[in-house]
Swiss-Prot record:
Major subcellular location class: endoplasmic reticulum
Organism for this UniProt entry: Arabidopsis thaliana
Extent of the signal sequence: 1-24
Binding site for a beta-D-glucoside: Q55, H158, N203, E204, Y346, E418, W468, E475, W476, F484
Gene (UniProt): BGLU21
InterPro entries the record matches: Glyco_hydro_1 (IPR001360), Glyco_hydro_1_N_CS (IPR033132), Glycoside_hydrolase_SF (IPR017853)
Protein's UniProt name: Beta-glucosidase 21
Protein role: Beta-D-glucosidase active on scopolin >> esculin >> 4-MU-glucoside > DIMBOA-glucoside. No activity with pNP-glucoside, oNP-glucoside and sinigrin as substrates.
Uppermost EC category: hydrolase
Disulfide bonds: C223-C230
Length: 524
């Protein structure tokens, strides 16, 4: 009755209720807990582990699987893959049922996998043949996950371009890849979309483009000869990476158009892989802007087109004609073409203003006018660097990066698609040493706490977290010498899996929680 007498007051009350409902939906709600555990996170938060087809499956001659880019790259250039290859990898193809039981043992909710393009289309295109045995393998894998109560998250492309497309037109160097990727994505969405609702089109496009076509550290190893280590290579640093990314982004947009037609109630995104940066010298006015600039080049390069429809302005300003342009139609397809931001976070470093770039030797890193420094102006390293660590450990950077994405990109939903710690054990590698991975345990503890603070204090909308990786596996140019798994794989003894200390910690964390964390905030 009162609302009839005071319509304006009633309208204001209604708006207040609507705003409150919206806020409740958008902002994460964290339970009050006395110890860090699964219970410290919002209801429905997903915890899982991650792998990628090429890194774990093996079975390269089964199901009529065609050769992939990394197969040929490692055969032709064994020294670029630490003398290793992924012909067998960790034999996930034959052992996935056993490995799914390891996931259950961890108490995880979800599992991130990728589909090998050439296991579906051995020659890259549907018209050249479909491997029904390959199609069936992924059906059986997905069904086994679902039977065990584990939600599948599927990556359409994790760096394994069919070699036939590389040979035919240069893979992602050609715009022909756009229609071929759309066809492949259409097929897997149609085939598996009824039971898989969470998808990633591309894994780490920055790494794929920069390391593969500018730095030459990953397949196909293209770079200019002035780049250290590239004296005998083919490629054009400072150009090809931008072309590859342009084609990749257009391929993503085409795939998402199909996805939204075919997969009802699904979500799709890209898994980005930025580091966090701290200014090299806080007193230098040139260093502070380097953080946002390098993040525009590293993260915004592929994220901003999927939100706004175009590249970051700073990239257009600094690169000029070397940065391809989207057409109006391409911009329209790219804009708002993700439902969440996928984030892979491992480490942080310092950013320093690069005052004297060499215009005769363009490269992605030089283009951003930023140099990366392991120590700041006071000669202090970032975070900590355990003796066998592959990368510096800096959990503060994780929280800062999450807050940065929230603030810059309008508070999107974020899924942590990879977070993990690499061990290079060298001559000390053994089952006993490898399973006593206390540094990985501490890494996970610190990063889970940092993520919890980002969610509960900074109100970042993180909804899932995947540890990289379930198993030690083939780590690209490092071969099997860099171990990231929660389970140790004995490469000398039948690929036997052994539970590591980090797996025990994660299992307890996801079960009933762990003892109250003794970590202090300044230790992060």
């Amino acid at each position: 009755m009162a609302l009839q007498k005071f319509p304006l007051m009633g309208l204001l009350l209604l708006l207040t209720i609507l705003v409150s409902v919206t806020t409740a939906v958008d902002d994460p709600v964290c339970p009050a807990t006395s110890k860090l555990s699964r219970a410290s996170f919002p209801n429905g938060f997903l915890f899982g582990t991650a792998t990628a087809a090429f890194q774990v499956e093996g079975a390269i001659n089964e199901t009529c699987r065609g050769p992939a880019l990394w197969d040929i790259y490692c055969r032709r250039n064994p020294e670029r893959c630490s003398g290793d290859h992924a012909d067998v990898a960790v034999d996930f193809f034959h052992r996935y049922k056993e490995d799914i039981q390891l996931m259950k043992n961890l108490n995880t909710d979800a599992f991130r996998l990728s589909i090998a393009w050439s296991r579906i289309f051995p020659h890259g295109r549907k018209e050249k043949g479909v491997s029904q045995a390959g199609v069936q393998f992924y059906h059986e894998l997905i069904d086994e996950l679902l039977k065990n109560g584990i939600v599948p998250f599927v990556t359409v492309f994790h760096w394994d371009t069919p070699q036939d497309l590389e040979d035919e037109y240069g893979g992602f160097l050609s715009q022909n890849i756009v229609k071929d990727f759309r066809e492949y994505a259409d097929y897997v969405f149609t085939e598996y979309g009824g039971k898989v609702k969470n998808w990633i089109t591309f894994n780490e496009p920055w790494v794929f483009a920069h390391a593969g076509y500018d730095l030459g550290k990953k397949a196909p190893g293209r770079c200019s000869r002035y780049v250290p280590g590239c004296e005998d290579r083919e490629g054009q640093s400072g150009k090809e990476a931008y072309l590859v990314s342009h084609n990749l982004l257009n391929a993503h947009a085409e795939a998402v158009e199909v996805f939204r037609q075919k997969v009802k109630g699904g979500k799709i995104g890209i898994a980005h892989s930025p580091a966090w940066f701290e200014p090299h010298d806080l007193k230098d006015s040139n260093d502070a802007p380097t953080v946002s600039r390098v993040l525009d080049f590293m993260l915004g390069w592929h994220l901003e087109p999927t939100t706004s429809g175009d590249y970051p302005q700073i990239m257009k300003d600094l690169l000029g004609y070397r940065l391809p342009q989207f057409t109006a139609a391409q911009k329209a397809k790219l804009k708002d073409s993700t439902d969440f931001v996928g984030l892979n976070y491992y480490t942080s470093t310092f950013s320093n203003y690069n005052e004297k770039p060499d215009p005769s030797k363009p490269s992605w890193k030089q283009d951003s006018l930023v140099s990366w420094e392991p120590k700041n102006v006071d000669h202090s390293a970032i975070g900590s660097m355990p003796l066998t660590a592959a990368l510096p450990v800096y959990a503060k950077g994780f929280r800062k990066l999450l807050k940065y994405i929230k603030d810059k990109y309008a508070n999107p939903e974020i899924m942590i698609m990879e977070n993990g710690y690499g061990d290079k054990l060298g001559t000390t590698d053994s089952v006993d040493v490898g399973t006593a991975d206390h540094n990985r345990k501490y890494y996970l503890q610190r990063h889970l706490l940092a993520m919890n603070e980002a969610i509960c204090i900074d109100k970042v909308r993180v909804t899932g977290y995947f540890v990289w990786s379930l198993l030690d596996n083939f780590e690209w140019q490092d071969g099997y010498k860099n171990r990231f798994g929660l389970y140790y794989v004995d490469f000398k003894n039948n690929l036997t899996r052994y539970e590591k200390e980090s797996a025990k910690y994660y299992k307890d964390f996801l079960a009933q929680g762990v003892r109250p964390s003794a970590l202090k905030r300044d230790e992060l």
